[in-house]
Amino acid sequence: MGPAGVAARPGRFFGVYLLYCLNPRYRGRVYVGFTVNTARRVQQHNGGRKKGGAWRTSGRGPWEMVLVVHGFPSSVAALRFEWAWQHPHASRRLAHVGPRLRGETAFAFHLRVLAHMLRAPPWARLPLTLRWVRPDLRQDLCLPPPPHVPLAFGPPPPQAPAPRRRAGPFDDAEPEPDQGDPGACCSLCAQTIQDEEGPLCCPHPGCLLRAHVICLAEEFLQEEPGQLLPLEGQCPCCEKSLLWGDLIWLCQMDTEKEVEDSELEEAHWTDLLET
């Protein structure tokens, strides 16, 4: 992995970012927003409302993007995260966080809220990445992110050709079987795979796993019967470790339609998880 840390996952980019104001007159102010393009969004904020920036940031720049949380399965999931981060007092998931403390800066308060959000349902089980766009402004969170949420540094790179993985690179992996084969069978239930999004396939070289989303989810959740969304598990074919988020993104990479950045995607099943 390069100095920028974890690469952006393949597929559409949905991020929720934290801006920090460098204007001496407004220094210390922050802004939370949603974006599909971090570089362009910062330019819009610094360009004012006429350039597409928010009214709260217009005329108060320059603004710097300090960090961005990305890896959301859909724009709706990211927008719900954005709303809760902006209004922690109104989210029942964050009732335990408490209001801003006396002497606590807006920046520190938003980092405290973020730390709790990454460990609160439903976000605690999403395959998110915490990226410090400005590594020099990095601070340790009051609660460390969950083990499956990696830290990354620097601006998000262009769409990555391969997903994040725990063990060695798969650059020399053999071509995967055609996921669109209408006669493909699930490796777990042996039934024909007819899912519109195609089967989940193991990315490890030589592994021929193909499985229904539900079948593999049930396999991964055997040790967590009370949960609905897996975090990770062992491939039932090659017995190597897999992150659930990587499997989903690999599947989406082959099925996702190209749309304009300004368009919002249809609701994902994780959007039904209440905030």
Swiss-Prot record:
Compositional bias (Pro residues): 148-161
E.C. numbers: 3.1.-.-
Keyword terms: DNA damage, DNA recombination, DNA repair, Endonuclease, Hydrolase, Metal-binding, Nuclease, Nucleus, Zinc, Zinc-finger
Residues annotated as domain GIY-YIG: 12-95
Domain of life: Eukaryota
Primary role: Catalytic subunit of the SLX1-SLX4 structure-specific endonuclease that resolves DNA secondary structures generated during DNA repair and recombination. Has endonuclease activity towards branched DNA substrates, introducing single-strand cuts in duplex DNA close to junctions with ss-DNA. Has a preference for 5'-flap structures, and promotes symmetrical cleavage of static and migrating Holliday junctions (HJs). Resolves HJs by generating two pairs of ligatable, nicked duplex products.
Region listing for Disordered, in residue ranges: 148-179
HAMAP family, per database record: Endonuc_su_Slx1 (MF_03100)
Source organism per UniProt: Homo sapiens
InterPro entries: GIY-YIG_endonuc, GIY-YIG_endonuc_sf, Slx1, SLX1_C, SLX1_endonuclease, Znf_RING/FYVE/PHD
Entry-linked PANTHER family: STRUCTURE-SPECIFIC ENDONUCLEASE SUBUNIT SLX1
Cofactor: a divalent metal cation
Top-tier EC class: hydrolase
GO cellular component, one term: Slx1-Slx4 complex
Name of the protein in its database record: Structure-specific endonuclease subunit SLX1
Any GO BP annotation: double-strand break repair via homologous recombination
Organism placement in taxonomy: Eukaryota, Metazoa, Chordata, Craniata, Vertebrata
